[in-house]
């Protein structure tokens, strides 16, 4: 490990108890580096996913994760909401509904809570999602609720059960499924759907994830064209999938988005983390530059991204060892 990154590994979270992981996550000591708080988060996620075999520990892990919603870090809280949606543990649903309904939480955190309810396929959350889709003053929240509603309805529909989808290379539960393999979409056709603002957002996301699953240079450049969209939500999802694909062809596009002074923090932060995942040599100075960014979400994302950069250039097999 290089000395530049040692400060990100000051606390060893391997083989910690659930309570020790919670203490690191919520920074009870006041000294836990952000990168290690993220490690504790992902370790707790692993426990929360074991609800079938270890229900008591899984419930406890879910509750400990939710304790972080009282933190000041917008980045950490949004990641907690994301993780709760990825666990498939329905114990997280009422906790996420509370976050969505809390107008004192930042937009990025509430958005992630709504998206997580969709990832959980929580039919019981349709009413609250409909409420905020119709009534919330923030476009990002309305759009996220729209996607979550459409995802839940698709998952529980005959169409959703019937469609033949490509087996994903990625473990994430996405806000929309990719387009079915039943039609042989050309990349240009998918690009046109992606950028057609007259189409439903759910359909455009389906094109996005189909392009992600193709993942070659042409598909990635088609995705990058979406960075001209007016929707911050849409652009942040494109940056997120670039962090999954890790194709260096998009590095110039991510750098440009990260450097936009007028761009929404939810987009810039996702671009920073994607650069950390891609981890080519030209990424390091860019991430270091944004350790002093004027926006706290982007600054913290640069810390996490640099931690990921170090991981990608090491021989470790797991980002969050359990």
Curated annotation (Swiss-Prot):
Places the protein is found: Cytoplasm; Nucleus
Catalytic activity from the UniProt record: [eIF5A protein]-deoxyhypusine + AH2 + O2 = [eIF5A protein]-hypusine + A + H2O
Pfam families: HEAT_2
Amino-acid positions noted as binding Fe cation 2 in the UniProt annotation, renumbered to this chain: 236-237, 269-270
InterPro entries: ARM-like (IPR011989), ARM-type_fold (IPR016024), Deoxyhypusine_hydroxylase (IPR027517), HEAT_type_2 (IPR021133), PBS_lyase_HEAT (IPR004155)
Binding site for Fe cation 1: 78-79, 111-112
Pathway the protein takes part in: Protein modification; eIF5A hypusination
Transmembrane segments: none
UniProt keyword annotation of Nucleus present: yes
Family annotation (Gene3D superfamilies): Leucine-rich Repeat Variant
Recorded family membership: Belongs to the deoxyhypusine hydroxylase family.
Protein name from the UniProt record: Deoxyhypusine hydroxylase
Organism: Kluyveromyces lactis (strain ATCC 8585 / CBS 2359 / DSM 70799 / NBRC 1267 / NRRL Y-1140 / WM37)
Designated gene of the protein: LIA1
